[in-house]
């Protein structure tokens, strides 16, 4: 039913414009694609194309193309659905300042701090991974190309200075972060696409391999599922993105529409590019090269440089440096945004138990979080902890934070019952598979 107003005719309540209390013309004006939308698409792609993408073809080569295809059939649709549900559960929340406050609004303060802590642990692991990776890799490249005589990473202060610079950039606001990330992310995307295309001339059908027995196929597909998902996963940026849109837009419907649109665009670009890249590398590289890369603990790019001769090898070497550094830097920015938001949620949850909310100095809290993030990242750098060995526990955390918790909210909160359906069952199954995947890998 349409209702007349001084701004025009309000659209039918069954449409997004109607739910937002707007006319169709007002709705079209409100959802216009702008620089902020572009920025969040860029940040999401930057988060997804992290350091792990250079190892994806190795995992696919080890397990076989059939395993990857089955894993993709399960993983990519499920990932799209659970990221969509994650956005919807955040956007529906009456209070949308940070992830723990959203959970608190739905389930109470105790659940908010418990599930917020789980989300926090996931982001701490990635803070460890990316802060250590960017310190060691940048120092290694500077030494390799003769810029420095020794490794700068041997000095603890190199890592401290580097992290301070990255955190300072990340904390200056979205506009600066979007500007810095745009060039790096577009370069990464073009590099990944170019690498996939460059391998087409070396495709061999025998690298497709034979179809393995059903039991082994399913088991290996579940083991490969975390690698498939994390190749284009950007759940770490979804919470800051929704919160940003909610703070900018008066209408929840407009904020939800813009967040979902940014996610859809990023997902589509990532799926086409990364899926082609992984399949192209597998058809060119094959199982034997993947085993060699695994045994030498090197990336697909490094092994490609070994079997590509002539000028192509030099090109792959240069490209690998660009992809590696840009991938780690932009992923660090995305992780830091999520880490800052999660930490703020936990701190505010604790402080509100001790004092009235109006007496809390949020600026002081944010400065404290910056210092905490720097010290946390620096401690990982100084200890040079084998953080990559910790990343396997991220699969169950992704399963819980991205799939099982949003699904539980749908069943628990009456306002979210509208999201029940077959897609929710697929999300739940995927969440359970992510939780058991590490145990199958080591069985």
Swiss-Prot record:
InterPro entries named in the record: Amino_acid_transport_2
Name recorded for this polypeptide: Probable serine transporter
Function summary: Plays a role in L-cysteine detoxification. May transport both D- and L-serine.
Localisation per UniProt entry: Cell inner membrane
GO cellular component, one term: plasma membrane
GO MF entry, a single one: transmembrane transporter activity
Keyword flag Cell membrane: yes
GO biological process: amino acid transport; cysteine catabolic process; cysteine transmembrane transport
Higher taxonomy: Bacteria, Pseudomonadati, Pseudomonadota, Gammaproteobacteria, Enterobacterales
Residue ranges that the Swiss-Prot or TrEMBL entry lists as coiled coil: none
Cytoplasmic side: 1-48, 132-149, 204-214, 286-297, 340-367, 411-421
Membrane topology: Multi-pass membrane protein
Keywords noted in UniProt: Amino-acid transport, Cell inner membrane, Cell membrane, Membrane, Transmembrane, Transmembrane helix, Transport
Organism of derivation: Escherichia coli (strain K12)
């Amino acid at each position: 039913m349409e209702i007349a107003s001084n701004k025009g005719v309000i659209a039918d309540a069954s449409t997004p414009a109607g739910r937002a209390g707007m006319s169709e013309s007002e709705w079209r004006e409100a959802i216009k694609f702008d620089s902020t939308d572009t920025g969040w698409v860029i940040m999401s792609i930057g988060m997804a194309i992290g350091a792990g993408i250079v190892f994806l073809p190795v995992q696919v080569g080890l397990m076989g193309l059939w395993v990857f295809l089955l894993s993709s059939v399960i993983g990519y649709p499920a990932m799209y659905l659970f990221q969509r549900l994650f956005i919807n559960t955040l956007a529906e929340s009456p209070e949308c300042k940070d992830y723990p406050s959203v959970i608190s609004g739905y389930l109470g303060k105790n659940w908010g701090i418990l599930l917020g802590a789980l989300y926090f642990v996931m982001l701490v692991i990635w803070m460890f991974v990316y802060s250590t990776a960017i310190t060691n890799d940048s120092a290694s490249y500077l030494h390799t190309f003769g810029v420095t005589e020794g490794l700068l990473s041997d000095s603890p202060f190199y890592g401290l200075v580097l992290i301070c610079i990255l955190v300072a950039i990340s904390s200056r606001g979205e506009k600066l972060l979007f500007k810095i990330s745009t060039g790096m992310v577009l370069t990464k995307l073009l590099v990944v696409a170019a690498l996939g295309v460059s391998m087409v001339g070396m495709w061999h059908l025998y690298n497709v391999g034979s179809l393995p027995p059903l039991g082994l196929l399913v088991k290996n597909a579940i083991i490969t599922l975390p690698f498939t998902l994390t190749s284009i996963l950007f759940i770490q940026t979804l919470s800051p993105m929704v919160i940003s849109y909610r703070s900018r837009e008066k209408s929840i419907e407009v904020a939800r529409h813009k967040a979902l649109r940014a996610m859809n665009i990023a997902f589509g670009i990532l799926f086409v590019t990364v899926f082609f890249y992984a399949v192209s590398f597998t058809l060119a590289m094959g199982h034997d090269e993947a085993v060699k890369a695994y045994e030498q603990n090197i990336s697909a790019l490094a092994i490609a440089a070994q079997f590509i001769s002539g000028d192509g090898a030099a090109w792959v070497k240069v490209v690998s440096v660009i992809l590696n550094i840009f991938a780690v830097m932009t992923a660090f920015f995305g992780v830091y945004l999520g880490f800052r938001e999660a930490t703020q949620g936990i701190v505010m949850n604790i402080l509100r138990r001790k004092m009235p909310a109006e007496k809390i100095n949020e600026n002081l809290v944010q400065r404290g979080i910056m210092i905490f993030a720097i010290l946390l990242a620096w401690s990982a750098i100084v200890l040079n902890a084998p953080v990559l060995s910790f990343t396997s526990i991220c699969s169950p955390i992704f399963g819980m934070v991205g799939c099982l918790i949003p699904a539980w909210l749908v069943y628990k909160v009456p306002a979210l019952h509208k999201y029940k359906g077959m897609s929710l069952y697929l999300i739940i199954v995927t969440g359970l598979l992510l939780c058991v995947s590490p145990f199958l890998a080591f069985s």
